[in-house]
């Protein structure tokens, strides 16, 4: 007998009750300048300070009544059974590209005596070759060819951006297929949590998207504007075809959602996901990066006849489109740093538009984006300001670093 889904997120701004985070770990200290591009980082955060900043973020949430869960703990609890643990290790090594016979065997032996939490942390951190016994060079050609590479298992430094590998929508999730091989490895943790964790395994959680799909989607491109309207980004990381798949699944499942607004944003690093340039902070207020307003196209996706999708390009301004679909008389777009070319460019690079709402009109923001923060306050938004000198080096803000599991309905 399946139990009711323990998930419930029907807005961006409903009071946040439960959230999933990942505290940065030793994966950050396995970054080197030579590996930054491969691992999708622009800089190397100082781990000690990054952890202090992340702890301040988590405490801010707790102080406001939010239950904070951690990714490594849930993942460890999901693989308690021996057969599931063995399956998890084999799949993890497959997805990490550990194909050399020697490397694979040595890693399995290395993992064998670890408890589950230590195992998960080590998988996240990556394994340097000098940590393990020498790989027999006769084991495989692949092992010999890769002998100069410092890792037998790459680190996963993007994990503290828990927003992207999966996304809670309503009572279900999209289990995402991420654009890059580096980040697609992260999805395995969510896969096992929702399949095998005691809190989730026997519950009715619909999957709006499956990670085995061939097109890409990432959680930073998935926003819930109301219990009837979703916003999704067609971006550097999310394909239009993926949005159509989500739409078909949601519209045929009896969920309350009636419309998906698909935002086509420029494909560039600074605008990686929709939530780096557009977030909801109150019933009728949104942050936006002014640079996307010109080239922005918005398409509405609704349920058509015979279970087909009806797709139209919205010709009105963004304000009018939002008013139309959200049933609002007025909409306020709060431009990152007021739209000033220099200030907005700087603050958007440090996620000035990437806010996390914990209640209507109440958001968590980075302290470094002082111009945008002042504008938010001038528009009546209550701010919870967190330190950000090191966390921001990963190119993600408070929304990127959090995956809501439960919000109050509004």
UniProtKB/Swiss-Prot annotation:
Keyword GTP-binding: no
Keywords of this entry: Arginine metabolism, Cytoplasm, Hydrolase
Bilayer-crossing regions: none
Catalyzed reactions per annotation: L-arginine + H2O = L-citrulline + NH4(+)
Listed GO biological process terms: arginine catabolic process to ornithine; arginine deiminase pathway
Principal EC category: hydrolase
Cellular location(s): Cytoplasm
Gene Ontology molecular-function annotations: arginine deiminase activity
GO cellular component: cytoplasm
Active site (catalytic residues): 400 (amidino-cysteine intermediate)
Family matches, as InterPro entries: Arg_deiminase
The enzyme's E.C. designation: 3.5.3.6
PANTHER family to which the protein is assigned, alphabetical: ARGININE DEIMINASE
Family listed: Belongs to the arginine deiminase family.
The protein's name: Arginine deiminase
Top-level taxonomy: Bacteria, Bacillati, Bacillota, Clostridia, Halanaerobiales
Gene encoding the protein: arcA
């Amino acid at each position: 007998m399946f139990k009711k889904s323990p998930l419930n997120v029907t807005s961006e701004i409903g009071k946040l009750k439960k959230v999933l985070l990942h505290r940065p770990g030793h994966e950050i200290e396995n970054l080197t300048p030579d590996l930054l591009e491969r691992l999708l980082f622009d800089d190397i955060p100082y781990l000690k300070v990054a952890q202090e900043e992340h702890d301040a973020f988590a405490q801010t949430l707790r102080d406001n009544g939010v239950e904070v869960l951690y990714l490594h703990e849930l993942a460890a609890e999901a693989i308690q059974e021996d057969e599931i643990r063995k399956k998890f290790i084999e799949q993890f090594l497959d997805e990490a590209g550990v194909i050399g016979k020697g490397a694979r065997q040595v890693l399995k032996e290395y993992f064998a005596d670890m408890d589950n939490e230590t195992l998960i942390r080590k998988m996240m951190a990556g394994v340097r070759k000098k940590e393990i016994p020498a790989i027999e060079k006769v084991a495989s050609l692949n092992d010999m060819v890769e002998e100069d590479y410092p890792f037998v298992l790459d680190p996963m430094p993007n994990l503290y951006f828990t927003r992207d590998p999966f996304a809670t929508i309503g009572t279900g999730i999209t289990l995402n297929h991420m654009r890059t091989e580096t980040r697609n490895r992260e999805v395995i943790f969510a896969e096992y949590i929702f399949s095998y964790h005691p809190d989730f395994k026997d519950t009715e959680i619909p999957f709006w998207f499956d990670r085995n799909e061939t097109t890409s989607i990432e959680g930073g491109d998935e926003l819930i504007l109301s219990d009837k309207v979703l916003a999704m980004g067609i971006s550097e990381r999310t394909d239009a075809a993926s949005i159509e798949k989500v739409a078909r699944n949601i519209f045929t499942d009896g969920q309350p959602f009636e419309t998906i607004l698909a935002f086509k944003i420029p494909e560039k690093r600074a605008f990686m996901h929709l939530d780096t340039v557009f977030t909801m902070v109150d019933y009728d207020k949104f942050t936006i990066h002014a640079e996307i307003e010109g080239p922005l196209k918005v398409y509405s996706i609704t349920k058509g006849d015979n279970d087909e999708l009806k797709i139209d390009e919205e010709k009105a301004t963004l304000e009018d489109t939002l008013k139309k679909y959200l049933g609002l008389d007025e909409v306020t777009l709060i431009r990152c740093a007021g739209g000033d070319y220099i200030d907005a460019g700087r603050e958007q690079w440090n996620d000035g538009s990437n806010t996390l709402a914990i209640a209507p009109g109440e958001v968590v923001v980075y302290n470094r984006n002082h111009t945008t923060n002042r504008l938010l306050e001038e528009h009546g938004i209550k701010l919870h300001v967190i330190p950000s000198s090191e966390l921001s080096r990963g190119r993600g803000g408070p929304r990127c670093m959090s995956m809501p599991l439960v919000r109050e309905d509004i």
